[in-house]
Design a protein with these regions (language model features):
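Non-cysteine beta-strand/loop elements that form the S-adenosyl-L-methionine
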Residues: 77-79, 88, 194, 401-404
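General structural feature for long, well-ordered alpha-helical segments within catalytic domains
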Residues: 4, 15-22, 35, 39-46, ...
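Conserved short loop/turn motifs at secondary-structure junctions
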Residues: 31-32, 141-145, 294-299
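A short small-residue
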Residues: 2-3, 21-25, 97-104, 193-201, ...
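Histidine/acidic-residue-rich, glycine-tolerant segments that coordinate divalent metal ions
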Residues: 63-64, 85-87, 94-106, 112-113, ...
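Acidic/His- and Gly-rich active-site-bordering loop/insert found
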Residues: 2-107, 112, 116-137
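Metal-dependent amide/peptide-bond hydrolase catalytic core
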Residues: 215-481
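Divalent metal-coordination and catalytic microenvironments
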Residues: 26, 67, 78, 111, ...
């Protein structure tokens, strides 16, 4: 493995500036779910120029693509994302909330880094395949719409991963370690009520209020929260409350629900009950209701064999060396965070490493930027979040790591994270992830026994818990509304 590590390290460092430029360019063009046309084409064209065969519009998603190099088996996928979040515009390298354009998008989850690291890993693996004449195929999967869109779930449904043997990915974080916990499955759907408009004072008896129906539905689901499993969550947002005039009986209103639980069977059960509440609200108000199923994703299925292999690579490369300017800026960011922010970050670190993880987290209460890799341990913990990587993980073995791109304590989906996502701190963490994924991919090419063990572990679970795509066939990906 030492020879592999040296080769991968040299290959990625040789193109360091190119990769940081690409990450920054995607940061400069923040696009939300299923509208990442610039970012997708930027990566696809660069991979095409590097000698990959690129297939666009995969899974009937215009900004999803596959870039492939090599021949035959095994086929190893590197999963890249590039979507941003609405309303998180923020100047880079600024330790106070200062938007570039108020109300516009921003990379609040570091997906400019996520996609570029997978891109860099794919290039490095291609160089290794060319250098050593090794058989096998490396693929970069351009996956849009992770943030609230479940792009990979749609792609799984359309069969684009059917011939893949294993997949690797990562996520930017404040620490280095393994993403080794289960996640929450979810369903997102909206209910649109239609009533009859009327003068709210002169003839309210002639109106039928869609807004009343939404209010009754949210009241009903709030009571439902008392009668669902403890780890389930039901969130909602009223996306249309009708016209802005209060003296009109509202003829239209809409509410969006996001339902989460550790298992999809529980999510589906709660979803069915929420749908009944919507029907009841329509009945009580003499309105009509229409449900629009938006998206869903399954829980994440860890693969311990593949995680161990990836952890070995991550541990070899280790955390980046930080200079005084980076540490000073990270301290400025930390000064804007609450003690609860820092504690939540430490809790996330602890959750990945068992008892050793708890000790590790306590030792790093005052750490500014991660300076060692967190311990790894197989765990039954469930992360209170969702990812469409989950659906890929039920089709084939998947492993993913975290890499330090932000000051310890930085919460996801915040201006602080956007600000750090275009700095040398983020770049160093991104390249660590790229090296880790590339070295693990090469290891899978060389060690057929390792790959077979990963697949056997996966099959042991899926033989008794077969995968069913949670998104109905008639549902198509939709941009953020």
């Amino acid at each position: 493995m030492q020879e592999i590590y040296r080769f991968i390290d040299d290959a990625i460092e040789a193109d360091r500036q190119r990769y940081t430029d690409i990450a920054d360019q995607i940061w400069d063009h923040p696009e939300t779910r299923f509208e990442e046309f610039w970012s997708a084409e930027h990566l696809a064209s660069a991979l095409e120029s590097a000698g990959f065969t690129v297939t666009r519009n995969v899974g009937n998603i215009p900004n999803a693509f596959i870039a492939s190099f090599g021949q035959g088996k095994p086929v190893i996928a590197l999963l890249g994302e590039y979507d941003a979040l609405a309303g998180l515009s923020q100047q880079a390298g600024c330790a106070q909330p200062t938007s570039v354009t108020p109300g516009e998008n921003g990379h609040g989850c570091g997906h400019n880094l996520l996609g570029t690291a997978a891109f860099a890993a794919a290039i490095a693996v291609k160089k290794w395949l060319e250098q050593y004449g090794q058989g096998g195929t490396v693929r970069f999967y351009g996956c849009p719409g992770e943030e609230g869109g479940s792009g990979k779930t749609f792609m799984v449904r359309e069969g684009v991963f059917d011939d893949v043997d294993a997949a690797l990915t990562w996520h930017p974080e404040a620490f280095a370690g393994m993403f080794n916990t289960r996640t929450l499955a979810n369903i997102q759907a909206s209910w649109r009520f239609k009533g009859i408009a009327a003068h709210a004072a002169n003839s309210p008896h002639l109106g039928r209020s869609a807004l009343d129906a939404v209010t009754l539905m949210t009241t009903g689901t709030n009571f439902l929260n008392e009668h669902i499993i403890e780890k389930a969550r039901v969130h909602y947002a009223i996306t249309n409350s009708g016209v802005i005039s209060p003296n009109v009986v509202q003829a239209q209103a809409e509410v969006l629900y996001l339902i989460r639980a550790p298992e999809m069977t529980d999510v589906q059960h709660i979803y069915d009950r929420v749908a009944k509440i919507a029907e009841g609200a329509a009945l009580m108000t003499e309105t009509t209701v229409e449900c629009r199923f938006d998206k869903a994703c399954s829980s994440y299925l860890p693969n311990r064999t593949l995680e161990n292999a990836m952890y070995q690579a991550l541990s070899h490369f280790g955390t980046p060396e930080w200079n005084s300017e980076e540490l000073a800026f990270a301290k400025q960011i930390q000064a804007t965070l609450t003690s609860n922010d820092r504690q939540n970050s430490l809790n996330n670190i602890a959750a990945t490493g068992g008892e050793n993880g708890k000790v590790f987290a306590l030792r790093h209460r005052e750490t500014v930027l991660a300076n060692e890799v967190a311990p790894y341990a197989a765990t039954d913990n469930v992360l209170a979040a969702s990812t469409d990587v989950g659906d890929v993980s039920w089709k084939l073995p998947v492993a993913q790591c975290f890499s330090p791109c932000f000051a310890v304590g930085t919460p996801l989906h915040t201006w602080q994270l956007v600000s750090q996502g275009r700095t040398s701190i983020a770049h160093k963490g991104m390249l660590l992830a790229a090296k880790t994924m590339a070295a693990t991919t090469v290891n899978l090419f060389l060690d057929s026994g390792l790959l077979q063990e990963c697949q056997q572990e996966h099959q042991q679970v899926t033989d008794t818990q077969p995968y069913h795509c949670p998104i109905p066939k008639n549902v198509t990906p939709s941009p953020l509304k």
